[in-house]
Amino acid sequence: MISNAIARRYAKALVQLGAEEGAVDRFGVELGQFTALLDGNADLASVLKSPAYRIEAKREILRDVLAKLNLSGTVSNFLQVLLDRGRIGFTPQIAHSYAVFADELSGIVRPVLTSAFPLDDAQVEGMKSALAKATGKRVELSAQVDSALIGGVVTKIGDKVFDGSVRTQLNRIQDILQKG
């Protein structure tokens, strides 16, 4: 939980810098590029995270990597601060929190809609417009199928879940009957 708090703090700071520079989207892409590089190169990630290597050596490696990625000065400086403070290992969590804060700033909500059967385009658009009306934000809906729901839909927006599935309703009825 502490790592999430740390990640949110750094992500919020970078989003604020991005907003000041009008580069929120670009910073998100650049942070994602660096995170993908670390995810794809375990040796690089372990060197940058390891306390066994001198900070000067890690700074030089990071500078070389940043030069090859051609990131903006702000994101490069941000990543150097993370390295200096021993927080470079939090980059994936920071990138995730950054995306959440950037969406908030842009008025975007990204719900996940799970249904028992595939929805057609009209149904997806109907759900999108209903969610946009309810949230007052632009909706970028992700739809998936889970046949275990039996029927109905489950909508997850951030940490809130709206469960209108038949499976949940049957479970509730079963609980009521068992309690008698």
Curated annotation (Swiss-Prot):
The keyword Amino-acid biosynthesis belongs to this UniProt entry's keyword annotation: no
Pfam families associated with the record: OSCP
Entry keyword set: ATP synthesis, Cell inner membrane, Cell membrane, CF(1), Hydrogen ion transport, Ion transport, Membrane, Transport
Database matches in InterPro entries: ATP_synth_OSCP/delta_N_sf, ATPase_OSCP/dsu
Primary location group: membrane
Gene Ontology cellular-component annotations: plasma membrane; proton-transporting ATP synthase complex
The organism's place on the tree of life at top rank: Bacteria
BP terms from Gene Ontology: proton motive force-driven ATP synthesis
Molecular function GO terms recorded: proton-transporting ATP synthase activity, rotational mechanism
UniProt keyword Ribonucleoprotein present: no
Membrane topology: Peripheral membrane protein
Subcellular compartments: Cell inner membrane
Family to which this protein belongs: Belongs to the ATPase delta chain family.
Subunit field text: F-type ATPases have 2 components, F(1) - the catalytic core - and F(0) - the membrane proton channel. F(1) has five subunits: alpha(3), beta(3), gamma(1), delta(1), epsilon(1). F(0) has three main subunits: a(1), b(2) and c(10-14). The alpha and beta chains form an alternating ring which encloses part of the gamma chain. F(1) is attached to F(0) by a central stalk formed by the gamma and epsilon chains, while a peripheral stalk is formed by the delta and b chains.
Functional note: F(1)F(0) ATP synthase produces ATP from ADP in the presence of a proton or sodium gradient. F-type ATPases consist of two structural domains, F(1) containing the extramembraneous catalytic core and F(0) containing the membrane proton channel, linked together by a central stalk and a peripheral stalk. During catalysis, ATP synthesis in the catalytic domain of F(1) is coupled via a rotary mechanism of the central stalk subunits to proton translocation. This protein is part of the stalk that links CF(0) to CF(1). It either transmits conformational changes from CF(0) to CF(1) or is implicated in proton conduction.
HAMAP family: ATP_synth_delta_bact
Protein name: ATP synthase subunit delta
